[in-house]
Amino acid sequence: MAASFLHGIETIETSTGPVPITVVKSSVIGLVGSAPLWAAVGAPAMWQPSWVVAAGQQLVDPNGNIQQCSTVGTTGTSAPAWSTTLNATTADGTAVWKLVTIAGTLLQAPTLVNFTANPNIAGSAAAYGPLIQGYTIPYALAAIQAQGAGQAIVVNVFNPDLHYTAITAQAMALPASGPQVLNLGHMGVWNVVVKNSGGSTTYINGTDYSLDPINGIVTQKAGGAITTGEALSVSFSYADPSKVQDSDVVGTVTGTMYTGIQALRTTYGTMGFFPKILIAPGYSQDPATAAALLSTAETVRAVALIDAPPSISPATAIANRGVAGNVFDTSSDRALLCYPQEQFSDLGLIPTGITLNSAGTPVQNAANATAVGPYSQWVAGTIAAKDLAQGYWWSPSNTQMTGLLGPDVTLYASVLDAASDVNNLNAQGIVTVFNAFGTGLRVWGNRSAAYPTVTTPNNFISVRRTMDVIEESVELAMLQFIDQPISNALISAILASVNAFIRSLIGRGALVAGSASYNPAENPSNQVAAGQLVFDIDVMPPPPAERLTFNVYIDSTLLSGLGDTNALTAVTLNA
């Protein structure tokens, strides 16, 4: 209260009592992988104006020449006319450039994706490009969306500035007759240089030929210098997702720059929430990638879904639980071990499969074949969808999945046989797939990798995730109490807030019981004098009904009712 002189009346408004606690998001997936941003709806051609650049590395222009700004702060004649941010310099005073965005989508920056069929809506999954073989993000987004999930935070690590293959002076020739079109044999091309067969003449894009960089097509231009049927020497680079390394996915922290999986740690500061289901399909079977997922999961209170390699037997998957250095050799209650990989109908484009029709028009050809993909992407979508439909306190187990054809190995599944493959896998903390007659393909397994080493209730996936939601929700809500004067009123307000939250969770079914309390014995005067308060929260989330047992008795005394006239009815038999 102000101590200054006042000849009048004042009103002091003070907020007291409990505050509402908001439940944090539980169903957001964190996805790290590779995406063909260059093929996304509305994406520019390689190295065009809307490909923003920043300091760090030289650019190569469409003719294969190194472009570098010679006059700091201006475009200069030797700098790309379409460059931006000309303010970074090297030791010699020149500005150099590095690709950082494509069509508005930041490389390495976590981006929130909402699953919508409209590719023109900001945050659409379509911004990460179509299904093209070799790129993991579009396939994962399709698997997630098929389960009905709502949102994902995506980190793309594919960068054509780094992940490409260069073709030098490849001998090619235009057709002797018909449409004068040259198929380079790869999608996503840039740095295309077309010369005559001897290499003495360099033809000019836009004058002598036109380029379709997405499909990798060079077309003769009327009036240009290229002649019908001419033999040519062509150099170019093409986007090559096979060049993405596990280290790219793991990422780094350099100053304020977070890349790969590490970038998921930054999302609370930019979006107000963390992803709670972490996947890196196609990469998580690598030990370093799995370790990065788990480390990040510990930091952001998430679960990390880790895949087994394709085509391994159930016995091998179980044995890997005890192989040092294997991704399945963990007892973390944040690790969900996903086995086996799954078959699905691959409708993705073949990046080397572009053909030309009789008019010389490029035709994109889809695989239209059965392929195998990481199980984690379907499990992640199932967890997120069940969170939205039922609640985060429900186990993902026994939930039917869509968009997949079945495991890549044969699994014996039965709820009646303890020796079945799926039961043996569950008994070792492995989440698998259940498929019996008429059941459909179902996520099967309630327990994290903590089981069987850890037998406390938090080895259940649903219990671990429920505790994460409760703990983080309470912590974030307590920010408004930080730095208030310690008093009985403050203690009462905190307890009332937390207990009201717990009661609401009990009412929803997220908790069986629980309460918050303040124990004076845990708060000695010297500790309180240091500004520190300790509260106890006792809660119990509902464990899943994993095993049902019926005690059945054959009771011969029930035969004593036979012959009772009250139990008999007249029956007329027809001849």
PLM regions: where:
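Short beta-strand-centered aromatic/proline hotspots
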Residues: Q67-T71
